[in-house]
């Protein structure tokens, strides 16, 4: 994506996010954007909307399926995107809107990689530690299993990482022995 395209995406995303905050609908809109993002990931809809061989009418029909989402703000954004024939940028607008919502509210989805799944009590205990160490609020905790860590965990959010894995500790020891 070039600077011109990013500027266009911001032109849609930033006023949308500002309005979402003015109306106090951050949680609801973020959840709906997450659902849209999941649909795009599962179906490859972003490629469909950006394909030059697909008619504007077909692209419009596809985007209209997301209207009546229960969020008037999101429905209005979709309508504006359709009216301005920017369907090909809709997925990027969704991603940028989510990013801006996270950035402004300082609430992030935290990814926690570990060898074994954490119990509910472990998740409850680690949440305040993550918030304190990373200086953010945890919107949700996404767990990923990674047997290559050997033990421990790796926490990632907002371009920050805490690596408390045995794999990393072994790498540090290896570097010191060189």
From Swiss-Prot:
Keywords: ATP synthesis, Cell membrane, CF(1), Hydrogen ion transport, Ion transport, Membrane, Transport. Gene3D superfamilies: N-terminal domain of the delta subunit of the F1F0-ATP synthase (1.10.520.20). It is found in: Cell membrane. It comes from the Bacteria. F-type ATPases have 2 components, F(1) - the catalytic core - and F(0) - the membrane proton channel. F(1) has five subunits: alpha(3), beta(3), gamma(1), delta(1), epsilon(1). F(0) has three main subunits: a(1), b(2) and c(10-14). The alpha and beta chains form an alternating ring which encloses part of the gamma chain. F(1) is attached to F(0) by a central stalk formed by the gamma and epsilon chains, while a peripheral stalk is formed by the delta and b chains. PANTHER family: ATP SYNTHASE DELTA CHAIN (PTHR11910). Belongs to the ATPase delta chain family. F(1)F(0) ATP synthase produces ATP from ADP in the presence of a proton or sodium gradient. F-type ATPases consist of two structural domains, F(1) containing the extramembraneous catalytic core and F(0) containing the membrane proton channel, linked together by a central stalk and a peripheral stalk. During catalysis, ATP synthesis in the catalytic domain of F(1) is coupled via a rotary mechanism of the central stalk subunits to proton translocation. This protein is part of the stalk that links CF(0) to CF(1). It either transmits conformational changes from CF(0) to CF(1) or is implicated in proton conduction. This is ATP synthase subunit delta. It comes from Streptococcus sanguinis (strain SK36).
């Amino acid at each position: 994506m070039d600077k011109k395209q990013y500027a266009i995406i911001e032109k849609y995303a930033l006023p949308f996010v500002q309005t979402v905050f003015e109306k106090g609908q951050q949680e609801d809109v973020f959840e709906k954007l997450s659902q849209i993002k999941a649909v795009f990931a599962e179906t490859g809809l972003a490629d469909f909307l950006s394909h030059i061989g697909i008619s504007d009418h077909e692209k419009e029909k596809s985007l209209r399926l997301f209207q009546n989402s229960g969020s008037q703000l999101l429905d209005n954004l979709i309508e504006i995107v359709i009216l301005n024939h920017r369907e090909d940028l809709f997925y990027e607008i969704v991603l940028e809107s989510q990013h801006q919502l996270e950035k402004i509210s300082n609430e992030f989805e935290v990814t926690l990689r570990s060898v074994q799944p954490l119990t509910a009590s472990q998740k409850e205990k680690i949440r305040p530690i993550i918030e304190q160490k990373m200086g953010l609020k945890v919107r949700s905790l996404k767990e990923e299993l990674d047997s290559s860590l050997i033990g421990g965990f790796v926490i990632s959010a907002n371009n920050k990482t805490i690596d408390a894995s045995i794999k990393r500790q072994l790498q540090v020891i290896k570097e010191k022995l060189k």
